[in-house]
């Protein structure tokens, strides 16, 4: 009984490998159909578009998180830079005052 199973398994493996080599078009030997790749891209927030020469181009669709949170490029960077400079100056002043207290002792 077990030998019949092994024979069927070997036959199926040989048949699949020979059948995939017989296709002249390499696109026909793919394991997953085109619809599966398009569905998985839709889940990831992307879509497939056709190029000029027939190739597939993957484009990213705007994700829903972009509607909720602002992107860093949309924020006013001058305010952030000014706040960072003030924080650096305060840090330097605190460091100098600590060194001055240490030298006075």
From Swiss-Prot:
Give the GO cellular component terms, alphabetically: extracellular region; host cell cytoplasm; host cell nucleolus
Motif RxLR-dEER at which residues? 39-57
Keywords for the protein's UniProt record, in alphabetical order: Host cytoplasm, Host nucleus, Secreted, Signal, Virulence
May I ask which residue range the UniProt record assigns to the signal sequence? 1-21
Induction remarks: Expression is induced during host plant infection.
- Does the record's keyword annotation contain Secreted? yes
User: Where found, per UniProt?
Assistant: Secreted; Host nucleus, Host nucleolus; Host nucleus; Host cytoplasm
Superkingdom: Eukaryota
What does its UniProt record remark on the domains?
Answer: The RxLR-dEER motif acts to carry the protein into the host cell cytoplasm through binding to cell surface phosphatidylinositol-3-phosphate.
Q: Which family does it belong to?
A: Belongs to the RxLR effector family.
Tell me, in a sentence or two, what this protein's role is: Effector that enhances P.infestans colonization of Nicotiana benthamiana leaves.
Output this protein's name.
Answer: RxLR effector protein PITG_18670
């Amino acid at each position: 009984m077990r030998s019949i199973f092994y024979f069927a398994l070997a036959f199926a493996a040989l048949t699949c490998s020979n059948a995939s080599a017989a296709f002249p078009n390499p696109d026909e030997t793919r394991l997953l159909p085109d619809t599966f790749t398009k569905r998985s891209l839709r889940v990831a927030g992307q879509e497939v578009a056709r190029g000029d020469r027939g190739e597939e181009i993957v484009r990213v669709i705007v994700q829903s998180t972009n509607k909720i949170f602002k992107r860093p490029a949309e924020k006013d960077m001058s305010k952030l830079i000014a706040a960072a400079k003030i924080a650096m100056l305060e840090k330097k002043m605190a460091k100098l005052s600590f060194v001055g207290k240490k030298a006075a002792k």
